[in-house]
């Protein structure tokens, strides 16, 4: 188990203005998550347009509107594509805190996971009470709130869409064990179902997987819960269920506790070898289904109805996908294509694998240990 210790007694805030910081933060969408903690502690943060997956519009309005509700101000730095966010008292005003953030009521325009988390991290040190309605309540958010409470924060309503935060003057250190990545768990369930001869996924924190195991069961996949492990036996055949009225099964993404959109790509790949048909409805992003063209090139029977919907007609393992060369457009499509390649006849080559690396650590090492034959090729 990897353990890390963090201590940040002194930070170089001038680094936020450097070209190096701007360049690095523009390459990583997660850089936006520094705004909340920096505002809470120092009353100042800098942000440029962050990078990340190209899966459609992924606006940051929820973050910024929340910070503005707390009293932060935004200013574009002249001559640079950079915004400075401040919540600092005037130098001529005696203020006991380094920030002027004040608690308030806010109704989020969407239940954004990262938006809620960012606002929570700012609000815990704001003066007064902050109420966040339509808050995200994914396990990721729950564990953040629980960790902050152990650090001295006062957050109630955890696991609901209504969070109440009583601001405190300071936080202290704590120990925290990070939850298993439920998207990685779901990806391995799909992989084991399609190509495995019996795979055990250990220490998955079953209570925090929500409906993920049941969605695979609706696809006809046998998923056994054994303690805190999941065992996926070899699936010689698996049949997609129909609705009770006999109509075609529809699987659609939704905010938690609904089906996470991050698993639709894997589920689509798994469906290509199922018995029966299923309609996938990707509601939350408009470009995430375009990768199915690559599965079609491999021999999958998929009808792309529009940017949000695709019908998969399974082969029932009667026709194997064929290998080919493809490129990973984003993290989740990348792992789905890797799963498809593992099940395909012949050799496949996947380019742009840094997308997969962003979400799956040492993926080829772990899969090769299970019997896969994956070779990483370093480009000249």
What are these language model-derived features?
Residues 1-380:
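Short, structured segments at the rim of ligand-binding sites
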């Amino acid at each position: 188990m990897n353990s890390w210790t963090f201590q940040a007694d002194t930070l170089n805030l001038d680094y936020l203005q450097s070209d190096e910081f701007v360049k690095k933060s523009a390459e990583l969408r997660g850089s936006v998550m520094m705004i909340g903690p920096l505002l809470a502690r120092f009353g100042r943060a800098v942000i440029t347009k962050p990078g990340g997956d190209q899966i459609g519009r992924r606006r940051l309005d929820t973050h910024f509107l929340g910070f503005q509700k707390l009293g932060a101000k935004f200013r574009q730095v002249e001559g640079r594509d950079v915004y400075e966010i401040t919540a600092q008292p005037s130098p001529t005003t005696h203020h006991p805190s380094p920030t002027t953030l004040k608690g308030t009521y806010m109704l989020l325009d969407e239940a954004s996971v990262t938006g809620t988390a960012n606002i929570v991290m700012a609000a815990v040190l704001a003066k007064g009470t902050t109420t966040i309605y339509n808050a995200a309540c994914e396990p990721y958010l729950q564990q953040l709130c629980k960790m902050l409470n152990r650090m001295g924060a006062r957050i109630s309503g955890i696991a609901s869409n209504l969070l109440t935060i009583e601001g405190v003057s300071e936080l202290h250190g704590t120990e925290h064990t990070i939850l298993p990545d439920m998207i990685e768990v779901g990806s391995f369930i799909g992989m084991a179902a399609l190509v495995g001869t019996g795979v055990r996924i250990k220490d998955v924190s079953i209570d925090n997987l929500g409906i993920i195991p049941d969605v695979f069961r609706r696809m006809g996949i046998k998923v056994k819960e054994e303690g805190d492990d999941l065992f996926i036996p070899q699936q010689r055949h698996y049949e997609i269920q129909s609705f009770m009225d006999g109509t075609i099964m529809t699987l659609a993404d939704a905010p938690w506790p609904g089906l996470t959109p991050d698993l639709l790509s894997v589920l689509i790949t798994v469906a290509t070898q199922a018995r029966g048909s299923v309609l996938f409805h990707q509601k939350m992003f408009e470009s995430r289904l375009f990768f199915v063209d690559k599965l079609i090139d491999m021999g999958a029977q998929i009808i792309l109805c529009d940017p949000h919907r695709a019908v998969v007609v399974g082969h029932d393992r009667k026709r194997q996908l064929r290998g080919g060369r493809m490129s990973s457009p984003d993290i989740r499509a990348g792992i789905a294509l890797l799963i498809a390649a593992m099940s395909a006849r012949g050799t496949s080559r996947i380019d742009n694998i840094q997308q997969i690396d962003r979400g799956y650590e040492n993926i080829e090492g772990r899969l090769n240990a299970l019997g896969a034959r994956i070779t990483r090729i370093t480009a000249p």
